[in-house]
């Protein structure tokens, strides 16, 4: 019973489908409860956790909050003093600290502001601080940042900040703290850390999860009601370094057994195990794994398996419906933790970068709030087969759940450790028979805090966040607990955020963004597999024999035709030429399948690289069309010192020779050719000898879009023959070249021997690309970027990483992680979607690499 993503719709349609959620009576009850909770909690402001106070003062809406978060993240893992000192100086110089000093009643917040915590106590304040000159003192501190006491003080302060997010450095320490603190009597433990980058990482995380399950079971004593005990949350990305839809086969073969082993262990110990939600492009695969776990006969009679669902995902209602149907079909209870969502910023940016039709998440927070309520109603209706777990720090959300909850339905609330404590304490104090509250409790060394810290701040540090406004007395209670359905109704038709354009409109009026593919959907991948099959229609054209190479006489004839057509083409309106390019971009996207097959089968591109190259070619067409209109649309009027009219007009130079490489046989070929054409020039283009079909197909597309055939000739032929003929032709007006440095030098020398005016040579050649890494960089991000840069396109691009320079203190760790990540790469057939690294372009190229190694 696989989950099938619903058809993509516009965001407004998805939002309207959620409504209505609350009845009038439920809405009134939710508002009354929320109002009472906020009022009661504000009366106890001095009891709030440090972290709530910190987030109210230092959100992500001011430079000082960002500076402190950078320090909190990086100082905990920078091993060397010099780098730490430089970071401290940079971040302390970045903010207006006077605006925060003394403003909060929390000692913790002011200590963080001044950076004066040292071994658990405050040092004496200097005189200028007592007089209120915090900014002046901090500027002086910046200049003295090499002093060990300053470094120690700030490291201590940052550890305290980190400790507010983390319940213990290991599971043993966490369990001791839970026994000591009543607010942690019921927890779901999360082992901190980035997703695995190596198989060794994955094995280490699996061992950590298993050890934690055993430790929790020992600490909890004999098994009872699974929902009355501590539970554990696991991230699938921590258990396999290649957890993605493109690696589905590997994931099911390697990740699934590992998760099954943990689920069986948790079931045997009577503990709940929850699969954490991650990025939306992993949603379908994660649900496939959850279904396999539910069907496992070894755990069938043991409740406790659960997963998190992110309400900001526009597929969340369909996911809830699928899970309920699955639980009923299998007669297997399932716990569902309903959260708002933790990756909103990256989901939006990723959709923009990938050119997706829309966003996988709602663009307005109020829409997420309504979706959370709509999903909550579905879960409550499915209880007790589904055990709802509502994760919220929102007083209105608590009130709405209590208003919707049928009498006697088992459920629980959840909160993040360090946040929401006062809100739930007030709820337990003032509301009879309040449901259990579980703390989501991260466990791990402070150095592993980054990913968790950033997600929590993005969730809770924004101006619109309930946590940010909850205790702010300047914000009216009615505004804090406002009903999201009412807020949504006030938006009218503007249900999608007007400040977040669709990915296609990312560049505004200038041009349209190129269209990509959502590779997280199995239906998309099935279509792509069909396109790339060697016996498919698209591949057949890619594998057809290429035409015979042109000869020098063909070059002469092409230049003659180009020179003859120059006047008519260049004197036409720039709008007409730009429109040709825009039609070509549209046609390229409409015929994407054929070009993907050509790139994979002729150039050896992997599917991901091929998609990116088609998009880049379309972007070139639209970008140069927009630039030509800007530069040539009207003359630029210049000053006339003696009353005369002076204007500057950009015109075509003549006929250009465009020589493109095999490593980007579509994108670079297209960029060279369309830039010359749209400005009124004519072109004789020589594509790479190994990839002629791609260039010829794009040339045909340009002709169909309106470029005269005589204005563009595409001549596959031997490079030296073309160069010797073209560079000697009297009609030549310039050369555009991308390729080796040696060939670029030869072209430069050949042009220098010509009589007459000096012709322009626009040359892009090779080089050594380096990445320089210091100890402030997160190792996982370094490895991700290094692997992508060095081995994308099999390393066959001029921008590929060639030299990685690492600071001594972190070199060994990064090298070990890099080696492990490289070991997980799949080298093979580029038509296989699981392939990461395809073949190099020729046998000679492969032999050269082997010789170099």
Predicted segments, located by residue:
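ALDH superfamily catalytic-core signature
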Residues: 701-707, 728-729, 734, 742-853
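Terminal low-complexity tails and localization/encapsulation signals of metabolic enzymes
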Residues: 432-434, 443-587, 597-598, 612-626, ...
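A structured beta-alpha segment of the ubiquitous adenosine-cofactor-binding alpha/beta core
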Residues: 645-647, 713-736
């Amino acid at each position: 019973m696989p989950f099938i993503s619903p058809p993509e719709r516009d965001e407004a349609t998805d939002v309207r489908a959620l409504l209505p959620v609350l009845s009038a009576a439920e809405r009134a009850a939710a508002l009354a409860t929320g109002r009472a909770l906020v009022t009661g909690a504000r009366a106890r402001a001095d009891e709030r956790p440090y972290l709530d106070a910190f987030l109210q003062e230092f959100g992500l809406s001011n430079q000082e909050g960002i500076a402190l978060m950078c320090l909190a993240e990086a100082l905990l893992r920078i091993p060397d003093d010099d780098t730490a000192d430089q970071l401290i100086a940079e971040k302390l110089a970045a903010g207006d600290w006077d605006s925060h000093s003394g403003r909060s009643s929390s000692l913790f917040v002011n200590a963080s502001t001044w950076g004066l915590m040292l071994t658990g106590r405050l040092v004496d304040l200097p005189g200028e601080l007592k007089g209120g000159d915090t900014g002046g003192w901090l500027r002086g501190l910046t200049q003295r940042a090499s002093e060990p006491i300053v470094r120690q003080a700030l490291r201590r302060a940052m550890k305290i900040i980190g400790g507010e997010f983390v319940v213990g450095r290991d599971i043993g320490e966490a369990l001791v703290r839970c026994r000591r603190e009543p607010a942690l009597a019921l927890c779901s433990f999360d082992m901190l850390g980035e997703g695995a980058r190596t198989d060794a990482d994955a094995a280490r995380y699996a061992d950590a999860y298993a050890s934690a399950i055993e430790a929790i079971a020992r600490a909890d004593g004999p098994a009872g009601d699974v929902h009355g005990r501590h539970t554990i949350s696991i991230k699938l990305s921590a258990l396999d370094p290649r957890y993605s839809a493109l690696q589905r086969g590997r994931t099911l073969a390697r990740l699934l057994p590992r998760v099954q082993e943990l689920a069986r262990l948790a079931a045997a110990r009577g503990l709940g195990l929850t699969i954490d939600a991650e990025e939306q492009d992993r949603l379908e695969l994660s649900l496939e794994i959850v279904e396999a776990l539910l069907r496992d006969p070894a755990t069938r009679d043991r409740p406790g398996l659960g997963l998190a669902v992110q309400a900001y995902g526009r597929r969340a209602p369909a996911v809830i419906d699928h899970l309920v149907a699955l639980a009923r079909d299998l007669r297997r209870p399932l716990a569902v933790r309903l959260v708002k969502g933790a990756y909103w910023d990256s989901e939006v940016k990723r959709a923009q970068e990938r050119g997706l039709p829309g966003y996988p998440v709602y663009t307005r927070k109020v829409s997420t709030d309504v979706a959370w309520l709509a999903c909550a109603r579905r879960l409550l209706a499915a209880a007790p087969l589904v055990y709802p777990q509502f994760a919220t720090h929102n007083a209105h959300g608590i009130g709405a759940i209590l208003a919707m909850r049928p009498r006697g339905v088992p459920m629980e609330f959840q909160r993040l450790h360090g946040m929401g404590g006062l809100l739930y304490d007030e709820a337990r104090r003032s509301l009879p028979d309040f449901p259990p509250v579980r703390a989501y409790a991260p466990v791990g060394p402070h150095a592993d805090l980054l990913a968790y810290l950033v997600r929590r701040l993005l969730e809770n540090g924004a101006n619109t966040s309930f946590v940010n406004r909850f205790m702010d007395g300047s914000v009216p209670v009615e505004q804090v607990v406002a009903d999201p359905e009412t807020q949504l109704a006030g938006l009218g038709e503007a249900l999608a955020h007007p400040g977040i354009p669709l990915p296609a409109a990312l560049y505004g009026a200038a041009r349209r963004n190129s269209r990509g593919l959502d590779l997280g959907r199995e239906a998309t991948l099935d279509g792509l597999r069909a396109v790339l099959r060697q016996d498919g229609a698209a591949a057949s054209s890619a594998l057809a024999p290429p035409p015979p190479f042109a000869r020098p006489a063909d070059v002469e004839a092409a230049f003659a035709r180009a020179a003859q057509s120059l006047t008519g083409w260049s004197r036409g309106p720039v709008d007409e030429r730009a429109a040709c390019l825009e039609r070509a971009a549209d046609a390229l996207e409409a015929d994407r399948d054929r070009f993907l097959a050509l790139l994979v089968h002729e150039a050896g591109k992997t599917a991901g690289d091929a998609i990116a190259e088609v998009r880049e070619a379309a972007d070139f067409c639209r970008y140069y069309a927009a630039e030509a209109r800007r530069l040539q649309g009207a003359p630029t009027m210049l000053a006339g010192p003696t009353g005369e009219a002076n204007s500057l007009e950009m015109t075509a130079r003549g006929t250009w020779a465009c020589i493109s490489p095999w490593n980007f046989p579509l994108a670079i070929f297209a960029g060279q050719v369309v830039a010359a054409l749209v400005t009124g020039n004519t072109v004789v283009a020589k594509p790479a000898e190994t990839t002629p079909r791609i260039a010829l197909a794009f040339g045909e597309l340009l002709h169909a879009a309106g470029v005269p055939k005589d204005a563009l000739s595409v001549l596959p032929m031997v490079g030296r023959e073309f160069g010797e003929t073209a560079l000697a032709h009297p009609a030549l007006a310039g050369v555009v070249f991308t390729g080796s440095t040696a060939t670029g030098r030869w072209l430069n020398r050949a042009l220098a021997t010509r009589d007459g005016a000096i012709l322009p040579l626009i040359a892009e050649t090779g080089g050594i690309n380096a990445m320089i890494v210091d100890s402030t960089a997160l190792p996982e991000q370094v490895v991700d970027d290094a692997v992508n840069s060095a081995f994308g396109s099999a390393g066959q691009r001029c921008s590929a990483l060639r030299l990685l320079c690492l600071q001594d203190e972190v070199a060994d760790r990064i090298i070990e992680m890099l080696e492990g990540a490289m070991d997980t790469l799949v080298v093979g057939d580029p038509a296989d979607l699981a392939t990461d690294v395809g073949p190099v372009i020729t046998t000679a190229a492969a032999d050269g690499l082997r010789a170099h190694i």
